[in-house]
Structures are given as structure tokens and as C-alpha cells.
Amino acid sequence: MGKNVVVLGTQWGDEGKGKIVDLLTDKVAAVVRFQGGHNAGHTLVIEGKKTALHLIPSGILRQDVQCLIGNGVVLSPEALLKEVRELEANGVAVRDRLKISLACPIILRTHVRIDQARERARGNDKIGTTGRGIGPAYEDKVSRRGVRLGDLCNPADFEIKLREIMSYHNFVLTEYFKEEAEDIDAALEELRQMGEEILPMAADVTDILHDYRKRGEHILFEGAQGSLLDIDLGTYPYVTSSNTTAGGTATGSGFGPLYLDYVLGITKAYTTRVGSGPFPTELFDDMGKHLAVKGNEVGTTTGRSRRCGWFDAVALRHAIQINSVSGICLTKLDVLDGLETVKVCIGYKTPNGEITRPPIGCDSYSDIEPVYEELPGWSESTVGLTSVDQLPENAKAYIRFLEEQIEAPIDIISTGPDRVETITLRHPFGE
């Protein structure tokens, strides 16, 4: 009987999901993206060779795996075709192994323009978006005026819808932001041409998923960004525009929640965040710089440096609860190698006393101070270890302490970027 596993980030993104998805795909028939867009960034290292993916599921590097993009993903045709061509240039077959939901909203040129204009207008109060049109595309989806991939199947109707929505966007650009209008005719022709390449890959992804389920195949659902960036449950308004938590799996793919068997939460051994927003354990000293340099903390999608801090057990307990996490994969343990001591945030100090759950709303974070537990570090290297018995005793103690604090088992430990640099204590697919 097949198992259906969700892999998602439990911090603010960049937890190392791509490697773990790639690691687990040797067991699956299909890998599915269910939310976000090309604002995601997954770097895979296979036998020393790096591959960066933003939209196509990480399973594409496994030749027998079907890759699916669900209806919850907002689709940039340009980004999709660029990624397809780059993979093909490296000898990876894509077009016969990738299926994209006909219900995917399309990201238009004007979505990108509006996204970037808004960020400029916010000045110092910017959200920190990637500027790729993700948010405006989701807005149009919710407002029921967006165009979807399936609309390209009817060119006449598509033109009517596109002219209507881009006229509205141009009004916003010219009248509110005082910027130049976008050429609708040029956008229409460009989308028609790209549609000719993309439509052969379009399909009813929900139906395909349930066919795999009925055949008893393993399916893996690949989350993007991180749980603390969820539009509803994250540090609003410094969040992304989609549901990055486990609930988004069902709505973004049409695969009912009762069919999901295991939720794997990916978590760094410390904490990072890109862009603006609350970050209670952020370090502004040499230790923060050390983590950033040793962890190579630069965003795959944006190229921006990530903010770094100690492990936040308070935030992680929240993420585990809202996702019904079955087990944790701890990544980048090796970044902590060589430190005399390591710290874990176990609570937040507020003017009204200590709390052990994150507050709701960003304003409540302004008076928060982290409460730390300090543990002894380890001088030995953990890089490339494949057995828990090989770990230094203090590293084992650190892992046990984290499990106690977050109230969840650590089932996988990543000890390096390559798929083979992994310690598996309990396999999500039970194998």
C-alpha cells in the first residue's frame, strides 16, 4: 500500500527541503508542488554538481519520477520554460515527465510590475517580496479575475480575459504608481507562443494524483518557503501569499487531507530568515556572521544574505502544531561544528511575563526577548556522517534536547549538502 508524505519547511524557508525531497524520491512514483511559485529556491547537490530549481519539483532529477505542479501554484510561463530548457541542456528529460494543472493561475508581466512598484513605494517599510509577481497573481485569483493555464486552450476567450485584466493592471500602474503602461498586444502574443510549448504539459493533476493513490503508489508533496511565512498563520504581514502549511497540500492539489500519511518538517539546527519581519533569536554579532559564512546563507532565488540566529524552539513548537508534523529532519548540523557552546531559545520574555508560544501579530514581537538554554558544543566534525553512533556525544545531547523542547521526534539528520550525507533514524515511507 502506498504512502503519501508531505515535506515542508517549519521555519522561515531555506531549511534545505530540496535535498530531502530529492533523497526521498527514490521511493516515490510522483512529486507534487502545491503552493507558491518561482519565488521558491531549492538547491540540489548530486555527486558534487549543483542544480537550482524554482518551480519544477525537485524529483525531476530522478528519471523514473513523475513531477506535478498543482492548482495551488501560480505559474510564470517565462520562468517555467527557462527552467525546462536549462534542465534539458544538462541532459534531464522534462517535458514527458512534467504535468501542470490547468487550474494554475498565470503570472503576467503586469503582476511583476505591480509587485515591484509596491515594494518601491513602501520604502523602508517594504515586506521583502522577491518582486516576481507572486502576491498580485494570488490577489487576482482570490478576486476571481485572474487568467489560468487552461484559459489558453480557448484563444478567443483568453484574449478577452487578458485584455480586461491587463487594462485594470495598467490603470493601477499609470494612475496610482505613475508608471508606464504595459503593452497588452505584446504580452498576448508572447503568452500565445509560450502556451504552444506549455499546453502539451497541461493536465488534470488532481485526477492523476488519485490514479496513483488508487494504484497504491508512493506520492511526495513538496512544500515551498516555510510555515512561519504562511499567509494566515505566519508573522503577518511579513509573510508569503500562499498557505505554506500542511493544509495547503490538500487545497493546492485536490488531494484530501485524510489521504496524507506523514508530514516531515524540515528544520535547520539554527534559524535563518530572508527579508523583513520578526526574528527573536537573530544575532547581530560575530556569531551571526559565523553562521552566515559557514552555512553559506545566501538565498537561492534572491541572492540576498540571510539573517541568522540560534535555534528557536518556541517558533518550532508552533510550526509542529499547525502542521501536525509526524517527524523532523534536522539540517545543517555540521554548521555548528567547532563551537564551544550552542544556545536554544526555550521561551520569550515579555513585559507581562514569560511565554512559550509565539504571539499573534508582528507588533507583539517588539517587546520580546529570547530566553536561552546554553549547551556544550562539540569540536569534532559531523560532516558526511551516516550513522547516529558516529555523532559526537555533545551533538547527540543537543539533538535529544531539541526533541524534548519541540515535543517531536527527529527522524532524519542532514550532515552535508549531498543526498548521501544523511542519517536516517525513521524513514517517512517506512522503508
UniProtKB/Swiss-Prot annotation:
Which residues does substrate bind? T300, T301, T302, G303, R304, S305, R306
| InterPro entries xrefs | Adenylosuccin_syn_GTP-bd, Adenylosuccin_syn_Lys_AS, Adenylosuccinate_synth_dom1, Adenylosuccinate_synth_dom2, Adenylosuccinate_synth_dom3, Adenylosuccinate_synthetase, P-loop_NTPase
Gene Ontology MF, one: adenylosuccinate synthase activity
Task: Choose any GO biological process term that the UniProt entry carries and state it.
Answer: IMP metabolic process
How the cofactor is bound: the record states: Binds 1 Mg(2+) ion per subunit.
Q: Where is the active site?
A: D14 (proton acceptor), H42 (proton donor)
Organism's domain of life?
Bacteria
Catalyzed reaction equations: IMP + L-aspartate + GTP = N(6)-(1,2-dicarboxyethyl)-AMP + GDP + phosphate + 2 H(+)
Assembly state and interactors?
A: Homodimer.
According to UniProt, the name of this protein is: Adenylosuccinate synthetase
Q: Which gene encodes it?
A: purA
